[in-house]
Amino acid sequence: MCHNPETQEFFPELNLKTREICGENWTADRLAERLNSFRDVFELSGGGVTFSGGEPSCQADFLTELLPKLTDIHTILDTSGYCDAEKFLKLAAMFSKVYFDVKLVDDEEHRKYTGESNRIILDNLMALSERAIPFHVRIPLIPQITDTEDNLNRIGRILEKLPNRPESIDLLPYNELAGAKYETFGKRFQLHKGIRNDMDIIRRFKKTAEEKGYRVHMEGEKRVK
């Protein structure tokens, strides 16, 4: 769900077995106090805090208030990049690094599957790179949609135009277990059961990117440092 924020509602949803919503509202001060209390744990483990979602930039004002209150904690913004440019760059600069999703390069295809243009996303990616903010590009690989040879090659060409390269390209293969999550919320899962990624196409893209000097990590494979 984290890499598909456009599928999420902005308000709490009940799944089919839920009788009540148990979440609670937090102030920036209260959350900062809680996170800072784990600072020693983060330091020993080499960990930190990742803000994902949904889409964390939808809570940009809250995060802008929260981040300065965190003391010596490594932070990651995991985002679709769909955000007002000025607000996005101000927010991104406050994080240790950014995980930036790139799904589809063709604008018509992007509108078809997400309901929105990708113009602001690609513009934000370019602006992020221009400001030399540390970032990783993550590609959710949806069978026959984002994992096609044409789309992956287009993503490759977009990355080559960036003034500063991503620290890595992270390939996220499709996992059909997501279908069960849709069912719990009474939503129709539109992909056919049993559908799989074309791993030959993905491996060719990975090999080509590595030959061009990119560090590429495929989820499920051992990360090579």
Task: For the regions a language model picked out, list residue spans one by one.
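Canonical Radical SAM [4Fe-4S] cluster-binding loop centered on the CxxxCxxC motif
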Residues: 1-25
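A structural motif corresponding to the C-terminal lobe/cap of the Radical SAM core domain
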Residues: 167, 183-208
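Conserved AdoMet/S-adenosylmethionine-binding subsite of the radical SAM
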Residues: 32, 36-183
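A polyampholytic, Gly/Pro-enriched intrinsically disordered region
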Residues: 97-98, 189-194, 217
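C-terminal accessory regions of radical SAM enzymes
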Residues: 150, 172, 178-181, 203-225
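Short glycine-enriched, charge-decorated loop/helix-capping segments at active-site entrances
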Residues: 17-21, 111-117, 186-194
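Electropositive phosphate-/nucleotide-binding environments in soluble metabolic enzymes
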Residues: 25, 149, 196-199
